[in-house]
């Protein structure tokens, strides 16, 4: 997914005549995505409801020397239209967002509205079938069956923050329903959580081989469909 994002951000900068790409990171938390993007030269606005997360973001940005490239806005996704201008962001990020909001469809529509015409929306979500597989392999068979049978991919009454998980078809329909054109729908973490750490430690070349395998498998169904996460890049039409 990093290659996809890097290519999109480069194209956005070129469309601006070499000026920095403008990124909106919704639910951006403590800056896991925004700080590296700012360090790469982007101008980033982060919308995040948690003041504690924003405080951590500020410290991270200061430490990285990119505080002047990040604007932090405290607020919820359902108020996004009141917090940021519509149609201005070259790339809108919703990474780890759609699983925890009350209304995933409304949230995605808000992300689409914030994107400039021709701009992109990048979403990263928990994969329902990946969660089923990982729990089964860990011996948590009852949880695996509950996740498989639940329409939202949620472990009801478990106290987990996640309200839903997605499969590839559901995510595609959600993006199209928000008026976006899906260009990339790939898996992230097909094998990484399954390969024993001892195997990676045993060979100096194993980590590189795993990365190459992940890249090769990311867009191939059915391997994509059992990844830990699903990443999509969708475009707002002109």
Segments the model singles out, each with a brief description of its role:
Residues 1-19:
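Conserved alpha-helix/loop element of class I SAM-dependent methyltransferases that forms part
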Residues 162-179, 185:
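Short alpha-helix
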Residues 93:
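A conserved beta-strand element that flanks and buttresses the S-adenosyl-L-methionine
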Residues 32, 36-79:
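Class I SAM-dependent methyltransferase SAM/SAH-binding core
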Residues 19-27, 120-149:
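Conserved class I S-adenosyl-L-methionine
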Residues 184-238:
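Conserved Class I S-adenosyl-L-methionine
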Residues 105-120:
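A short glycine-rich, Lys/Arg-flanked "PGG" loop and its adjoining helix->strand segment in the class I
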């Amino acid at each position: 997914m990093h290659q996809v994002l890097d290519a999109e951000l480069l194209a956005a900068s070129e469309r601006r005549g070499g000026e920095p790409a403008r990124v909106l990171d919704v639910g951006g938390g403590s800056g896991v995505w925004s700080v590296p993007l700012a360090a790469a030269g982007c101008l980033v606005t982060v919308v995040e409801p948690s003041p504690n997360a924003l405080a951590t973001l500020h410290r991270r940005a200061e430490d990285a020397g990119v505080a002047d490239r990040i604007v932090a806005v405290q607020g919820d996704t359902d108020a996004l239209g009141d917090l940021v201008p519509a149609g201005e962001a070259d790339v809108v990020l919703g990474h780890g967002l759609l699983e925890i909001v009350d209304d995933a469809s409304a949230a995605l529509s808000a992300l689409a509205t914030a994107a400039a015409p021709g701009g992109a929306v990048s979403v990263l979500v928990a994969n329902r079938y990946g969660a089923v597989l990982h729990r089964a392999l860990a011996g948590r068979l009852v949880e695996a069956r509950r996740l498989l049978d639940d329409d939202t991919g949620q472990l009801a009454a478990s106290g987990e923050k996640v309200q839903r998980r997605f499969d590839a078809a559901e995510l595609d329909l959600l993006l199209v329903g928000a008026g976006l054109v899906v260009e990339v729908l790939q898996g992230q973490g097909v094998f990484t959580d399954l390969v024993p750490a001892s195997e990676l430690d045993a060979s100096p070349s194993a980590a590189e081989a795993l990365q190459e395998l992940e890249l090769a498998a990311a867009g191939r169904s059915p391997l994509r469909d059992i990844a830990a996460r699903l990443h999509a890049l969708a475009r707002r039409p002109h």
